[in-house]
Amino acid sequence: MIKIETVLDILKKDGLFREIIDQGHYHYNYSKVIFDSISYDSRKVTEDTLFFAKGAAFKKEYLLSAITQGLAWYVAEKDYEVDIPVIIVNDIKKAMSLIAMEFYGNPQEKLKLLAFTGTKGKTTATYFAYNILSQGHRPAMLSTMNTTLDGETFFKSALTTPESIDLFDMMNQAVQNDRTHLIMEVSSQAYLVHRVYGLTFDVGVFLNITPDHIGPIEHPSFEDYFYHKRLLMENSRAVIINSDMDHFSVLKEQVEDQDHDFYGSQFDNQIENSKAFSFSATGKLAGDYDIQLIGNFNQENAVAAGLACLRLGASLEDIKKGIAATRVPGRMEVLTQKNGAKVFIDYAHNGDSLKKLINVVETHQTGKIALVLGSTGNKGESRRKDFGLLLNQHPEIQVFLTADDPNYEDPMAIADEISSYINHPVEKIADRQEAIKAAMAITNHELDAVIIAGKGADCYQIIQGKKESYPGDTAVAENYL
């Protein structure tokens, strides 16, 4: 529960409060109202709910519907002129985050918080950190792939970073479940729409940056995308940064007065003797490590997670055991066909991650390579050109273009857009299962490989705005082994 006096104090302190409007009368103070719940979903309200009217798609009808269920108060950036009082604020999403924090008892103060950001690798690094901290502590984890608040039950997340009310609710559940740490992914969108507003992390990790999530409903430019990624650094007590990433110099300047560790070729924390399933580290993590996830970028993610966990109480032994134990569904999963050919299933869904995936596979597999790939509809449109230009440089790869969450677009039109940048023949098969079957049929022996990119462990296709059931790339590939 939360008193209205507390709500108003929080909003005023942060410069978010404008006024209360009740039946046309303006108020600066108010008392004798207590809220037993908070919500941004108009279908989940009672007479004791404080409701947040948020989002570009919010309609007055939602509010009127909530009032028929007994709703008596709401927060908004404007007066919707309905028959209940409104708390007017300058920024509804900032207000929601601060009120949620207080409503759930400030759970962020009772947990050690670790956050990862980057264009790619967030989920893998989060899994490494979870497995490392599980050796000697009781972590909770919020990830794109899986969320656990008790260390035993896992469920799929709807967003990379949950809405603030859901986030602080989950943190509170983690506290109730006697968790000691919380590891989470923080997207640029989370800062763009203030899902983590007011939250300070104990350690923030910046893995890498490449142009992505640039489009009409995401970030208008790379500058905007990079700026919102960097906000994690100024909202973390200590930071870990990949010194080999693009634009590292500006990050180095930004964090010079903070506790920090840099890893990569320019600093002490480096990777040596990199092999498929092992590597050595220098610097703070000096030693030899076993790893199940193939690829140098996964070793970089492991080092980033290790450095972060070292600051949060993990021992070097914990770090070695945790890295060795880590597997991630849909992230560099490897299957073997009856003819010995390898099938690599990975979430790689932008030009840079696909480039790294191809390089890793071609390092270990020197025969025929087939690639199954699509690009999402109605978002990340810049990826299509990136994919096409990349694949134009790889005439040795037999490309099968197919559907990958086409949404309201025609998957074959997306395939045509990708192939317009490719000067050699490609196959186009709308049905993803058929595309996988066709790609796997071209292999003959153990040096051949099939790369199935984009969906990872997702068991759905987004079509016409809805998640339609799909067996998942791993299950489909297993049918044709």
Swiss-Prot record:
Catalytic activity: UDP-N-acetyl-alpha-D-muramoyl-L-alanyl-D-glutamate + L-lysine + ATP = UDP-N-acetyl-alpha-D-muramoyl-L-alanyl-gamma-D-glutamyl-L-lysine + ADP + phosphate + H(+)
Keywords attached to this entry: ATP-binding, Cell cycle, Cell division, Cell shape, Cell wall biogenesis/degradation, Cytoplasm, Ligase, Nucleotide-binding, Peptidoglycan synthesis
Location in or out of the cell: Cytoplasm
One of the Pfam families matching this protein, by short name: Mur_ligase_M
Pathway named in the protein's UniProt entry: Cell wall biogenesis; peptidoglycan biosynthesis
E.C. no: 6.3.2.7
GO cellular component: cytoplasm
Binding site for UDP-N-acetyl-alpha-D-muramoyl-L-alanyl-D-glutamate: 42, 160-161, 187, 195
Single GO biological process annotation from the record: regulation of cell shape
In-chain residues carrying the UniProt-annotated modification N6-carboxylysine: 229
Role description: Catalyzes the addition of L-lysine to the nucleotide precursor UDP-N-acetylmuramoyl-L-alanyl-D-glutamate (UMAG) in the biosynthesis of bacterial cell-wall peptidoglycan.
Protein name (record): UDP-N-acetylmuramoyl-L-alanyl-D-glutamate--L-lysine ligase
